[in-house]
Amino acid sequence: MPTVLNGNAIREKFLQFFESKQHRRLPSASLVPDDPTVLLTIAGMLPFKPVFMGKRERPAPRVTTSQKCVRTNDIENVGRTARHHTFFEMLGNFSFGDYFKREAIGWAWELVTGVFELPPERLWVSVYEEDEEALVLWQEVAGLPPVRVRKMGADSNFWESGPTGPCGPCSEIYYDFHPERGEGDIDLDDDSRFLEIYNLVFMQLNRDSEGTFSELPRKNIDTGLGLERMAQVLQGVPNNYETDLVFPIIRKAEVLSGRDYFKADDQQKTSFKIIGDHTRAVVHLVADGVLPGNLGRGYILRRLIRRMVRHGRMLGIAGSFLPQMATVAVELMGGAYPNLLESRELILTRLATEESQFLQTLETGERLLDEILGRSEKRISGVDAFMLYDTYGFPLELTMEVAAERGLEVDVAAYEEAMEKQRERARRAAKTVDLTQGASLADLERTDFLGYRNVASKAMVKLVLFEGEPIERASAGASVQLVLDQTPFYPEGGGQIGDRGYLSGPDLLVRIEDVQKRDTVILHTGRIERGTVATGDSVQAQIDLADRRRSQAHHTATHLLQAALKKVLGESVQQQGSLVAFDRLRFDFSWPKALSQAEIQQVEDLVNTWIAEAHTLSQEVMPIDQAKARGALAFFGEKYGSEVRVIDVPGVSIELCGGTHVRNTAEIGLFKMVSETGIASGVRRIEAVAGPAVLEYLRLRDTVTRQLADEFKVQVEQIPQRVAALTSDLKQAQKQIDSLKAALATARAEALLGQAETTGGFRVLVADLGDTEPEALKSAAEHLLAKLGEGGAVVLGSAPAADKVSLVAAFGKGAVAKGLNAGKFVGEVAKITGGGGGGRPNLAQAGGKQPEKLKNALSEASSKLSGALGA
């Protein structure tokens, strides 16, 4: 039997083995890829996609990595199968035009049988059915008998990057858990017997747009060995979750829930596994700069967190528990991924905040479920059930359980249909790493950007687009997109909007309003003011210099702002987005709470101090490794090549940046923060102005304050006191109004006491209180019940708006003991008015949308009370 190894040892032995084969070890890339076509790093090869495409220089001829990955296309299988995960580590060895099939097969076999000591008789191999070379090599190099090398079709053993581009056959190594079953009638897809542990992709072909294959001039190797799967094999456990990579997290969930994983039923075990898996995913996502949100990768993180909370509740874990789970995961993986330790506080804060908000959302979901139950006559629709699950985290089982209590059923078939549609969307989104997307302008030569040194230049028109289609020429009045051979116009990027300006020629004037970059081509969008423009024309390109100066002042000010935030708040501040415009700047950053006025003042003062110190900026192009070694900040989501531009404000800030900047900070003049707000959980936004825009802002503010002073008939400096006085008066008036409404409701209630009827020894009162607001209606019901005593039963209704009904049921102890439940009672009555609701057995509220049916609802309430209490 092979030596038992822990997960860290497996990872290290793999990397050391390939280092001994002259591979360069590289660290894991971020889960947030440079590739804008992919939300998350879903494969070990993804960071090398530009290398495989020939768009970036290879970091070395041979490379080995342990790459962290997150996939959610099979999220419903997580915890239910032995080996599905959202987070996993892919160990890989890569060759960029260096070695090929023979070496890849030989080293793979040496690794699994020599280093990891897997018995050869337990290993099977698959090859692509047309790859005779691989079939022979497995027998020659590894000594495998032909019976244990299986030919398989393109679905499983031919790798494609997309409809066109690099592709090739692949070969997989499988571990046999049950060799005693013999070698006849073998199905490598039988998960109960075989586990795929190592995949070798031989990237040797290129497919063109007509589907024709040709040999690649430089053949590549892309491999992947799943760390969790190898750990399962070497540690002799029945599934990936019980390896030392995941099980310590599950152990923490055992402690918090008071349950034993090994004594749990199947559903409880699934919940334990989901929590163990998702904890690993969420700590890495947060550490890599992902924030919970409603779009893209932010939604993926939010969904994982909500699943954790839901499965924690299913295990009986009360209250907040995510930070405790995350602490175990950070300690478990921090040795291999030090950024987890560095981001520990950020991770715990983010998860605690999101968990707290979701627990509140769950309460909202419960109220929504009450409304759905209230308007459903026989069954809850599948659409509603899926909405409860997808938006509020309600499992189908919980919805069905609550519905059954009300005598309803759930349309499970429609629910499953909605779920399958979501799964299909996820599968389509994550099916492959597409190496060909975004190549629509690839046939054009790159546009040379001259804008760092020039504000004007001559240029030749290479392409004219009208409504997205290429045309030969366009005339005055047309809105067009133009591609030039060279340009001084800065294209929108890195948060900075594109330059504006003009293209001119003999009897030609084109006003340029927007400039964008598409791959290596720069598109100038504008309107032809005069003349005609055609492909091949020579034009003079001139940017609006005043606009450029404003935008570069704002861009440099943005760098200073980030440096000031890090100095005042701490290095954990991370940029989450930015906008650099002619008239303002906007900077989004990670921070869990609003800045105090003192912190805002500190940040603003620091920026203005650095401006006044007149720092001369350094703008250099250098290799990215050199830039990072100098401490230059790089940002998630930005695409960087092997050569990068570095903006250095000496002693203040150093960042990778392709934008335009002032030469000296003194050119900015002045910086003023306009606002600081929250835009999402854990994300703050600062809006500010710099340079001439500060004067415009101050003029506008001065105009507004003078108008307010005139309106209030006070001096400008007295405005705050006047506003405070008016606010105090308004609050006092509102209190008086609320008090009068409550008094009116109480008076109405007192007047109704005489209408109370005696039924079976109980005092019953059902009444309409006109347009009384819900809170006042509730107070009136409680007041009446107190007057009627423990044998009282009160149902009140009102129509506070044209499309709104409010209902309250308040029952004394005697009525409750008789079997009445205020929550169920008022919910049933509210259905008549097109609504629903619920609450406690003794006090509950409900609402409706049809005031014209309030009378019928109250009549029904009276009848139901008579029937229940008079018996």
Swiss-Prot record:
Its cofactor is Zn(2+). It catalyses: tRNA(Ala) + L-alanine + ATP = L-alanyl-tRNA(Ala) + AMP + diphosphate. Residues 834-871 are annotated as: Disordered. One of its GO terms (molecular function) is zinc ion binding. CDD domains: AlaRS_core (cd00673). Its main location: cytoplasm. Keywords: Aminoacyl-tRNA synthetase, ATP-binding, Cytoplasm, Ligase, Metal-binding, Nucleotide-binding, Protein biosynthesis, RNA-binding, tRNA-binding, Zinc. It is found in: Cytoplasm. GO terms for cellular component: cytosol. InterPro entries: aa-tRNA-synth_II/BPL/LPL (IPR045864), Ala-tRNA-lgiase_IIc (IPR002318), Ala-tRNA-ligase_IIc_anticod-bd (IPR018162), Ala-tRNA-synth_IIc_core (IPR018165), Ala-tRNA-synth_IIc_N (IPR018164), Ala-tRNA_ligase (IPR050058), Ala_tRNA_ligase_euk/bac (IPR023033), DHHA1_dom (IPR003156). Catalyzes the attachment of alanine to tRNA(Ala) in a two-step reaction: alanine is first activated by ATP to form Ala-AMP and then transferred to the acceptor end of tRNA(Ala). Also edits incorrectly charged Ser-tRNA(Ala) and Gly-tRNA(Ala) via its editing domain. NCBIfam families: alaS. Consists of three domains; the N-terminal catalytic domain, the editing domain and the C-terminal C-Ala domain. The editing domain removes incorrectly charged amino acids, while the C-Ala domain, along with tRNA(Ala), serves as a bridge to cooperatively bring together the editing and aminoacylation centers thus stimulating deacylation of misacylated tRNAs. Belongs to the class-II aminoacyl-tRNA synthetase family. This is Alanine--tRNA ligase. The lineage of its organism: Bacteria, Bacillati, Cyanobacteriota, Cyanophyceae, Gloeobacterales. The gene is alaS.
